[in-house]
């Protein structure tokens, strides 16, 4: 990528981040971002496929920091139960802190893009390793189901409409996904 194109892309991300923080992700359109920057829509879409794509890049630095700390959990805690409990607390807090951006990413036109992202793969690998069993198909299924239950929309629904506390949500996930063997590792 040319230097000026790289600078334009960075400027777009910075202005989008600023507008999202000030007015909320859901209140800012791609058109508004282009107008704020004084660029055409073509320029904006040359860098980002859609708003979901832009949101993913806006939050990318935070995702990288999150993953670094997330991986450290396995070094700091030893039982599967502790690792899962602490990792869920950390992940759920990240979802609360970044709800609007994550909802935008997950609601994008290309539903598979999120599941093919490096962030999803890191989460998958983390929990797959935690659930590892002789049945690889079952382990993959279990990991995918956990991550689906951790999607921003499912989490928000449970908290906002079912009125489940965050701690209860975490504990329910621990009960569902860690069998007695996993609790005593």
Swiss-Prot record:
Domain of life, source organism: Bacteria
InterPro entries reported for this sequence: DNA-bd_HTH_TetR-type_CS, Homeodomain-like_sf, HTH-type_Tx_Regulator, HTH_TetR
Classification via Gene3D superfamilies: Tetracycline Repressor, domain 2
Keywords: DNA-binding, Transcription, Transcription regulation
A Gene Ontology term for the protein's cellular component: protein-DNA complex
GO MF terms held by the record: DNA binding; DNA-binding transcription factor activity
Aminoacyl-tRNA synthetase among keywords: no
DNA-binding segment(s): 29-48
Range of residues in the leader sequence: none
Keyword Glycoprotein belongs to the record: no
Domain named HTH tetR-type: residues: 6-66
Any Pfam family: TetR_N
Protein name, per record: HTH-type transcriptional regulator SAOUHSC_02897
Biological source species: Staphylococcus aureus (strain NCTC 8325 / PS 47)
């Amino acid at each position: 990528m040319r230097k000026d194109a790289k600078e334009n892309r960075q400027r777009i991300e910075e202005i989008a981040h600023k507008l999202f923080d000030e007015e909320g992700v859901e209140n800012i359109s791609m058109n508004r971002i282009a107008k704020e920057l004084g660029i055409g829509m073509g320029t904006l879409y040359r860098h980002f496929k859609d708003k979901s794509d832009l949101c993913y890049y806006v939050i990318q630095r935070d995702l990288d920091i999150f993953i670094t700390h997330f991986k450290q959990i396995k070094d700091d805690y030893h039982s599967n139960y502790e690792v899962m409990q602490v990792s869920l607390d950390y992940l759920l807090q990240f979802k609360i802190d970044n709800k609007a951006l994550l909802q935008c990413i997950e609601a994008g036109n290309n539903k598979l893009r999120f599941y093919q992202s490096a962030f999803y793969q890191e989460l998958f690998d983390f929990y797959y390793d935690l659930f590892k069993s002789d049945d690889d198909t079952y382990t993959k299924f279990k990991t995918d189901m956990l991550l689906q239950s951790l999607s921003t929309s499912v989490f928000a629904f449970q908290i906002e409409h079912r009125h489940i506390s965050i701690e209860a949500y975490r504990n329910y996930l621990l009960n569902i996904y860690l069998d007695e063997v996993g609790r005593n590792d």
